[in-house]
Amino acid sequence: MILYEYPFNERIRTLLRLEDLFDRLEYFLGQDHAQQHHVALTTLFEIIDVAGRADLKTDLIKELERQRQALAPLRANPQIDQDALDSVIGEIEQGIAMLNQTVGKAGQLLTDNEWLTSIRSRAIIPGGTCEFDLPAYYAWQHRPAEDRRADILKWARPLVSLRMGTTIVLRLLREAGQSGKVIATGGSYQQMLSGRSYQLMQVYLDDSLLAFIPEMSANKYMLWVRFTQQDGDLRPRSVDADIPFLLKLCNF
């Protein structure tokens, strides 16, 4: 199955972007080539930009605390797997503790690093990190892969709590959803929300339907899913076929 997700609000949109960036950072950090570590470092800069919202840490703590309070009464329910419940609550409490220990804005230690700041300011310029622009960075790229990886891990360490909080919140949100099989008649599907509010829409497509690309949108009254295909130049074109898919709407 191929999963497409659509956030209903800016907060979830930010968390999805952070999740994508953290995954990219982890992948390229696990490689050994200097160019791959360059991508890892520029991805770290992107994470700082996205996470720079002053209230992001507060939002995560509040949401985790709300989830902990919602789950705590279930400890009195004999039909609930208490070991699994304790594991989830323990993970939430660990996430809250780590976020509370984070001082200042996300990535503040990186922005205070003059050498990293110089690289960051040049990285936004096309071709701006050549050896004649940043000879010290060029020299760093010729260090052993293990040394470069250790440096990036050290620089990324202040963001570990942010990643953990993001991961927990998104996992809990994705698990709190209702799903059903629907059909996009003539390539289009719409559904009234009947006053209910959601935070995330998921569209699951069978692998055999890879050629069909869902374009999703929503407001507080209705959601739409419209499928397109790409022509030889990869430009989108409308679809007239009936397309089955699994729709899941998630909300805490």
UniProtKB/Swiss-Prot annotation:
It is found in: Cytoplasm. It holds the Pfam family ZapD. One of its GO terms (cellular component) is cytoplasm. Keywords: Cell cycle, Cell division, Cytoplasm, Septation. One of its GO terms (biological process) is division septum assembly. The keyword Lipoprotein does not apply. Belongs to the ZapD family. This is Cell division protein ZapD. It comes from Cupriavidus taiwanensis (strain DSM 17343 / BCRC 17206 / CCUG 44338 / CIP 107171 / LMG 19424 / R1). The gene is zapD.
